[in-house]
């Protein structure tokens, strides 16, 4: 027996409500709480976050066979063996998501702390330059500079025993507390203890009420603002090339454009007006051409209707008598009788 149309209709509705998955599942996020820089013997929590309704989470440590099928990994005491790269993923049905971005879990306090100093001094005027120097007694080739409030430190190779972090064109955003770390490239996740804090003070700056933020900034905005114009350069003993990285924070834009932005918007409006005028001219030309063609067709039709009339028959010839008009009429009448 063939299925009825009603049953087929209900089946189609049921299948239409089943969500179809196209492509891989979106990747989750992995974070370390309270921080990815963990002192030895201190607790840390790794949390994998995906969409609601996940069937299974998997959190794994790369370069090893360690993994667990849970979204949260609590480490009560940080060990050297637990430092490294982590990532996570989740499963819905038979589909696995893309892996999360890698998280670098660093164990600090493995080696003795370095020293951090500022040249020419920790107090610098706005617009000036200052260099933060990190120095250690051990032959480390990797150094990291960390500013309180930033999500991640700056890591760069330097010369043995010492690293320089120049800050060009200091602004008020550079003021704060800094620390540095030293480590070896052979064990990139085993760091020294942090240096003693260095307070960088920027003088000659003032914040007007109009520049105060009206809402709490996002973490991305805090990172960009706190690292404005920070240039980090390094030189290696083997390689003579010098590289630098500059991060510039743009000020908060107002609602109305100013300066070059206003000129850009004015030019854009002029371009739109010119384009509109050109389009109107083209439409007017099309309308004029159409009106002219219609008038021409009507003129041709009028010529076709006005045909020449047939010629009239010739009138009979009459003779005028001496007696005037009456005599002529009598002559015609007499000729007609005779004929």
Curated annotation (Swiss-Prot):
For region Disordered, the annotated ranges are: 299-339
**Transmembrane feature ranges:** 268-288
Pfam families to which the protein is assigned, alphabetical: Ig_2 (PF13895), Ig_3 (PF13927)
Which sites carry carbohydrate? 92
Protein's GO biological process: collagen-activated signaling pathway; collagen-activated tyrosine kinase receptor signaling pathway; enzyme-linked receptor protein signaling pathway; immune response-regulating signaling pathway; platelet activation; platelet aggregation; positive regulation of platelet aggregation
Gene3D superfamilies per the UniProt record, alphabetical: Immunoglobulins
Q: Which residues lie on this side of the membrane: Extracellular?
A: 21-267
- Quick one: signal sequence residues? 1-20
Record carries keyword Secreted:
no
- GO cellular component terms, A-Z: cell surface; extracellular exosome; membrane raft; plasma membrane; tetraspanin-enriched microdomain
Gene Ontology molecular function = collagen binding; collagen receptor activity; protein tyrosine kinase binding; signaling receptor activity; transmembrane signaling receptor activity
Q: Could you list which ranges are Cytoplasmic topological domains? A: 289-339
List each copy of the Ig-like C2-type domain by range: 26-104, 114-196
Changing residue 95 to H has the effect of: No effect on collagen binding
Known post-translational modifications? Answer: N-linked glycosylation at Asn-92 is not required for the cell surface expression, but contributes to maximal adhesion to type I collagen, collagen-related peptide (CRP), and, to a lesser extent, to the snake venom C-type lectin convulxin (CVX).
Q: Which domain of life is it from?
A: Eukaryota
**Complex formation:** Associated with Fc receptor gamma chain. The GPVI:FcRgamma complex is associated with the Src kinase family FYN and LYN. Interacts with TRAF4. Interacts with COL1A1, but not with COL4A4.
Disease linkage: Bleeding disorder, platelet-type, 11: A mild to moderate bleeding disorder caused by defective platelet activation and aggregation in response to collagen.
Q: What does this protein do?
A: Collagen receptor involved in collagen-induced platelet adhesion and activation. Plays a key role in platelet procoagulant activity and subsequent thrombin and fibrin formation. This procoagulant function may contribute to arterial and venous thrombus formation. The signaling pathway involves the FcR gamma-chain, the Src kinases (likely FYN or LYN) and SYK, the adapter protein LAT and leads to the activation of PLCG2.
List the protein's name: Platelet glycoprotein VI
**In which organism is this protein found?**
Homo sapiens
